[in-house]
Amino acid sequence: MVKLFIGNLPREATEQEIRSLFEQYGKVLECDIIKNYGFVHIEDKTAAEDAIRNLHHYKLHGVNINVEASKNKSKASTKLHVGNISPTCTNQELRAKFEEYGPVIECDIVKDYAFVHMERAEDAVEAIRGLDNTEFQGKRMHVQLSTSRLRTAPGMGDQSGCYRCGKEGHWSKECPVDRTGRVADFTEQYNEQYGAVRTPYTMGYGESMYYNDAYGALDYYKRYRVRSYEAVAAAAAASAYNYAEQTMSHLPQVQSTTVTSHLNSTSVDPYDRHLLPNSGAAATSAAMAAAAATTSSYYGRDRSPLRRAAAMLPTVGEGYGYGPESELSQASAATRNSLYDMARYEREQYVDRARYSAF
């Protein structure tokens, strides 16, 4: 189908009169008159050329009419993609090759392929049939309709046919849909037109940026502040306390082998210190009590070296050792009031020293 433009029509001309005039050269598909011009669609290209040749400047009702091919805006169907082009081929040579099939509006070579814009769709179809898979300058080129939506019209084009969303009325660079199919953010354009949005006020100490933030911002003051001397001393004491408990819990329990009934068990030392009882210190307390009972016998015995040597001599048939025979009598021990019988000396010195040395 070829569209013809008819200009300078007289007011007396009608559609039926124009249709009958062009049907002399071929089948007319459509005829429209708009004021003093009109359009005629002829099915055959040869018939359209004959009509242009014979009816151009034809006198109708005393007025010479103009008949020529319609120069409509090129559409996407007239854009051809030409692949596998020789590197020595130029735009003029490629244009001349396609002009054999019809008028060429634009021809652009990009590396080894090119885009050719033909004026009429019929000419583009004929060029595809005649030039596809043919030899041109030593290479077999491929010609087909272009499927690209970018610059469907020759030149810079207009705001129609956005190649991103397919809608009209805006440039492709201003399309609200980005390449991923999502609506683009127009924050930058808004800031350029109306100014940037004011940033929120600076938050004070302890405030959170988000309401109900489970984690919040890190408080460097609480983490890295210098702790007081009391806090450091308390931490060291707690650590030493735990160390003493672990050390004393491994000491074996000592069984008392002496008679300590002569000691005064009711004496109370107001300066005596005891650790708080816990699960790990039960065995330690029992061991310390047994050691204190054993040590008290040392301070309650006779200090005379002569009497002690005579009392400790072994009997016949017996070896050296300690037993009930080697001990002083309870009566002699009870009659003597030694300064060493005080309750504050009833504990083992070395055990207490190891116990409180960590402090």
From Swiss-Prot:
Chain residue ranges for the region called Interaction with TNPO3: 196-359
Molecular function via GO: RNA binding; zinc ion binding
One Gene Ontology CC term in the entry: nucleoplasm
InterPro entries assigned to the protein according to its UniProt record, in alphabetical order: Euk_RNA-bind_prot, Nucleotide-bd_a/b_plait_sf, RBD_domain_sf, RBM4_RRM1, RBM4_RRM2, RRM_dom, Znf_CCHC
Main location: nucleus
Subcellular location: Nucleus; Nucleus, Nucleolus
GO term, biological process aspect, one: RNA splicing
Domain of life where this protein originates: Eukaryota
One Pfam short name: RRM_1
Keyword annotations from UniProtKB, A to Z: Activator, Metal-binding, mRNA processing, mRNA splicing, Nucleus, Repeat, RNA-binding, Zinc, Zinc-finger
PROSITE patterns, alphabetized: RRM, ZF_CCHC
Cysteines paired by S-S bonds: none
Chain ranges of zinc fingers (CCHC-type): 160-177
Domain RRM: 2-72, 78-148
Expression across tissues: Expressed in liver and kidney (at protein level). Ubiquitously expressed.
Subunit structure as annotated in this protein's UniProt entry: Interacts with TNPO3, which may mediate nuclear import of the protein.
Role according to the record: Required for the translational activation of PER1 mRNA in response to circadian clock. Binds directly to the 3'-UTR of the PER1 mRNA.
Protein name: RNA-binding protein 4B
Native organism: Homo sapiens (Human)
